[in-house]
């Protein structure tokens, strides 16, 4: 997608701007549900060199799994990224939960549906996968 999108945390201390983004994947794994504070985490991929941050120093980084880092606002706790490689590549997974306004993207898949919260009945027409979304490696802006 070629429209610059913006996202920010609840308190406004941290924000990102991404020049291009992929479509969105909805993750139902327990870690993403807890990090997002809801029934699922929503994430998209951007090129690392096309993302700019304001308040980046206010991010706290947490190794949620071996080799995977999540980042959130140290002031309000809003998740700003998904689980990114500790040794980063040219892409970054950002939290769509933090997006502002209209965006040129849509949910294209739901992953880890076997881990869905029992209280969540579902809502999307996006395909469901019991494990990880098999298209992550080809998902690009």
Regions found by a protein language model. Name each.
Residues 1-8, 13-141:
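A short Gly-Trp-Pro
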């Amino acid at each position: 997608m070629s429209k610059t999108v913006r996202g920010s945390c609840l308190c406004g201390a941290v924000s990102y701007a991404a020049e291009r983004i992929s479509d969105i994947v909805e993750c139902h794994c327990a870690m993403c549900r807890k990090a997002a504070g809801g029934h699922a985490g929503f994430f998209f991929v951007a090129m690392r060199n096309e993302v700019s941050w304001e308040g980046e120093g206010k991010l706290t980084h947490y190794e949620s799994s071996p080799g995977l880092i999540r980042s959130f606002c140290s002031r309000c706790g809003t998740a700003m990224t998904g689980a990114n490689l500790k040794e980063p590549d040219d892409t970054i997974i950002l939290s769509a939960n933090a997006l502002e306004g209209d965006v040129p993207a849509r949910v294209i898949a739901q992953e880890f549906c076997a881990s869905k919260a029992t209280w969540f009945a579902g809502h999307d027409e996006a395909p469901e996968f019991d494990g990880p979304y098999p298209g992550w490696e080809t998902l690009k802006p």
